[in-house]
Design a protein with these regions (language model features):
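Detector for outer-membrane/organellar transmembrane beta-barrel domains
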Residues: 91, 112, 125-159, 169
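Short glycine/proline- and aromatic-enriched beta-strand/turn motifs that initiate or cap beta-hairpins
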Residues: 1-58
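Transmembrane beta-strands of outer-membrane beta-barrel proteins
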Residues: 1, 35, 47-51, 92, ...
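Outer-membrane beta-barrel "beta-signal"
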Residues: 40, 210-222
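Flexible, solvent-exposed loop segments that connect beta-strands
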Residues: 11-25, 59-83, 115-131, 200-207
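Residues that define the transmembrane beta-barrel architecture of outer-membrane proteins
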Residues: 17-19, 29-33, 86-90, 103, ...
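Transmembrane beta-strands of outer-membrane beta-barrel pores
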Residues: 3-9, 53-59, 98, 111-117, ...
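Short loop/turn motifs that connect adjacent beta-strands in outer-membrane beta-barrel proteins
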Residues: 42-48, 99-105, 146-151, 179-186
Length: 222
């Protein structure tokens, strides 16, 4: 189990008129928190379980031009708006340990549940999109332990690519693990995470955006 902070920067466009997250909506780097817990066991036929909850929120103010179209109702005039983008999600992953030695390899499937929205709120007009959805992702994780050092390196990813929806969420990290108590190990983690989201008129949603940056986490293992 553990938790940390991800310093994520948004890039790309959302909406039917390709509204840029940086230059138009003035969204910038934000610290977003995450927590996770994993349960592993020695029973061969039963998968291991990992659950992670990730906050992904950005807020700001912007001046949008007439014709700006987030979800079907273009702004009729230039207007100052409050901007909110929320991609908060929870992952439930079932996986098997294929290798568990100096090299670790886990493979499985993730159910990702988004609970968020995107909105532009002005004095005379507002637009909002609910970003509530559950989807399956392929999951993989590979790691290498450096013997006698407490150091290890890992790469993990969740991925899906179907007709109207593409999501690639990967992270690379280095962990230093040490004994905290006789029955408790602690790990300090430094990593880099990138999440790419492409939607092509999926339930009237359109996006081509990425969110990436460094993260730091603390892990406890019993």
């Amino acid at each position: 189990m553990g938790g940390g902070s991800w310093q994520a920067s948004p890039e790309g466009d959302i909406g039917r008129t390709d509204i840029n997250l940086e230059s138009t909506l003035n969204l910038d780097e934000e610290n977003n928190q995450f927590v996770f817990v994993a349960i592993e066991h020695p029973i061969p036929l039963l998968p291991n379980i990992r659950v992670q909850h990730s906050e992904m929120e950005w807020n700001g103010d912007a001046l949008v031009a007439a014709g700006t179209n987030l979800n079907g109702n273009p702004f009729v005039s230039t207007e100052q708006v409050a901007v909110s983008l929320d991609l908060t999600h929870t992952d439930a992953t079932l996986y098997y340990e294929i290798l568990d030695n100096v090299v670790d390899l886990d493979l499985g499937i993730t159910a990702r549940s988004f609970d968020g929205e995107a909105s532009l709120i002005g004095a005379t007009q507002q637009e909002a999109i609910d970003l509530d959805a559950i989807g399956p992702l392929l999951y993989g994780r590979v790691g290498v332990d450096i013997p006698l050092t407490g150091l290890s390196a890992h790469v993990l990813a969740n991925w899906i690519n179907v007709d109207e929806f593409r999501l690639i969420d990967w992270a690379a990290e280095i962990m230093y693990e040490f004994d905290l108590l006789p029955a408790l190990d602690a790990g300090l983690i430094l990593g880099y995470r990138s999440m790419l989201v492409e939607l092509d008129e999926l339930d009237d949603l359109q996006a081509d955006a990425s969110f990436e940056g460094y993260y730091f986490a603390l892990q406890l293992r019993f």
